[in-house]
Amino acid sequence: MSLKDFVLIRVRAGKVHGLLGKYYTWKDNPPEEITKLPVLDERIDERINFVWIDSPTPKVPAENFAVAWEGYLIAPMEGDYIFFIETDDGARLWVDGKLVIDSWWDQPPTVHHSPRVRLTPGYHSIKLYFYNKETFAVIRLGWIRPDGKAEIIPSTNLAVKLSNEIVVKGLPEDYTIELWAGEKIGSAKVVNGIAKIDANNILQPIDGYFKVHDANGSIVYTSPIIRDIWGGDEYEVAEV
């Protein structure tokens, strides 16, 4: 098979706007580490702006449930941000691994603010834990931006990658594909028609390109620059 008349096309983008939410249930007292509980449901929530008068999902009870949201915050500008949550009952918020709001107790709907958090433009890790005790729950996540705008954080400023692999399908057996962005980021050999590049260390989307080597090591294809390459991307060989 010759790749001279073929291109790689992205058939699935790994970057999705929102945060990955994992839903749990608990007994007795709300646990300090909810992620040690069995996961009842999992989904990507575009933004955190919920008032539940019943179960948050069909698989989760209306009482004694918890949610762990994780992903990335996309800061639009450099400056000091103040984060706020409205919660009923408890919640904790981390930005770049630092606990900035800790309100882990039973309470009616209450608004809590973080201290000022200095952010550079771009991607920052974010994690929000929430638990609810009785039927009726509230959880909202917002910010006050450096320009003074206060809002629930929009989905366009939240992102998650679908997996820690970049998958390429349709290349010949024993070919190798490399991902480059100034330097080589990763590579994988084609096995059973599929190459899987480890994207665990790609912490935010990158603009890069692929090089394809045949079984003898010769470069047979170099892609154009592709924007926002990230874990969960899937590519296929297509004829041109």
Model-derived regions, located:
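Short, aromatic- and glycine-rich surface loops/edge beta-strands on solvent-exposed regions
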Residues: 1, 9, 128, 205-218
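Acidic/polar, compositionally biased interaction segments
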Residues: 6, 10-164
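Short, surface-exposed beta-strand/beta-hairpin micro-motifs centered on an aromatic residue
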Residues: 84, 194-200
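Short proline/glycine-enriched turn/loop motifs at strand-loop junctions of beta-rich domains
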Residues: 86-90, 169-175, 205
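Edge beta-strands of extracellular beta-sandwich domains
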Residues: 139-140, 215-235
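Short, acidic Ser/Thr/Gly-rich low-complexity loop/linker segments typical of extracellular
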Residues: 184-194
